[in-house]
Every structure is written in C-alpha cells, then in structure tokens.
C-alpha cells in the first residue's frame, strides 16, 4: 500500500481500500502507524479510511465526519472500528458510536491511549508529549500557526564575537 503524503493526510484524509471485511475509521495523523501495523501483520481483511488530521484543531468536525463515514460505509463492511478517542468532542463521538453500534478507542485523547488509559488517569499532570512522525513534520501547520505561536526570529540581533575581559 502506498504511503500517503502528509499534506493529503492533513487536509483530505485517505482511503486505503483493499477489499477488507473490517473498516478502521481513523485520524489521518495515525495513518502511517496503522498502515505499518496492517502491513507487518499482513492484515488484508482490514481497510483504512482516514479523516483529515487537521480536524484535531477543530474537534467539532470529528463527530459529524465520523457519522457521515459510518453512513457511507456501514453496508460494505461486517464491522467498523473508530480509531479515535474522545479527541475534544465532549462525549459526542462516544454517544454517536454507541448509537451506531460501532466500537471506538477509550480515553480522552491519543496521549492517553498511547500511554495506557489507566496509567494516564493516575497522573496529576502530563509527563509526556507524544509526537507521531506526522505531527513532527506538520508541527508548523498544527501547532505554531493555529495557536499563534510562530517561532520568534532572532536574526535582527547582533551577538558580540569577542567578549571583553
């Protein structure tokens, strides 16, 4: 299966249909990792459909997009799994999945399920910030620019080349 480019994953998602009986509806930010797992295990019975990763910056778009995808694909698959945690939907995604009879990942967000939900819940504060290869390559588009934290340029400063003694 071809590796998708980051720009497509960020803005459009992807469809890795190979005739499987199970569909994974996932975040585009996790596409490469999921594709690697499918390939390594030769799981040809599983198809992957990813929503645009940029939805993490607009969590209100996740639930309607998952609902549309379930409606579009439900008849063509024996089982659909949603590879999202709550991801800022305020429980809306969980309620949708329960109503549709579709399983999803547990937890508040991917940081929690990466670490393990039980271990994550026991902590009073974050002890790790998880970066997938996708997020590292898309850090400007997903973090700096949307949060108004564009890196400060220090090119205007002149540093002394010799210290006075």
Where are these regions (language model features)?
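N-terminal basic/disordered segments at the start of proteins
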Residues: 2-40
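Glycine-rich, highly charged phosphate/nucleotide-binding loops
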Residues: 59-71
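Short, high-confidence coil segments that cap the C-terminus of an alpha-helix
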Residues: 77-78
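Conserved small/polar residues in nucleotide/adenosyl-binding loops
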Residues: 155-161
């Amino acid at each position: 299966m071809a590796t998708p480019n980051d720009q497509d994953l960020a803005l459009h998602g992807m469809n890795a249909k190979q005739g499987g009986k199970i569909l994974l509806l996932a975040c585009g930010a996790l596409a490469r990792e999921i594709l690697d797992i499918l390939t390594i295990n030769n799981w040809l019975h599983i198809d992957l459909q990813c929503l645009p990763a940029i939805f993490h910056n607009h969590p209100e778009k996740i639930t309607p997009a998952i609902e549309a995808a379930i409606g579009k694909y439900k008849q063509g698959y024996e089982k659909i799994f949603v590879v999202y945690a709550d991801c800022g939907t305020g429980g809306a995604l969980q309620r949708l999945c329960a109503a549709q009879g579709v399983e999803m990942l547990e937890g508040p967000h991917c940081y929690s399920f990466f670490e393990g939900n039980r271990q994550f819940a026991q902590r009073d504060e974050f002890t790790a910030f998880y970066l997938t290869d996708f997020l590292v390559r898309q850090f400007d588009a997903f973090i700096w620019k949307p949060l108004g934290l564009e890196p400060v340029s220090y090119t205007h400063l002149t540093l002394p080349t010799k210290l006075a003694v």
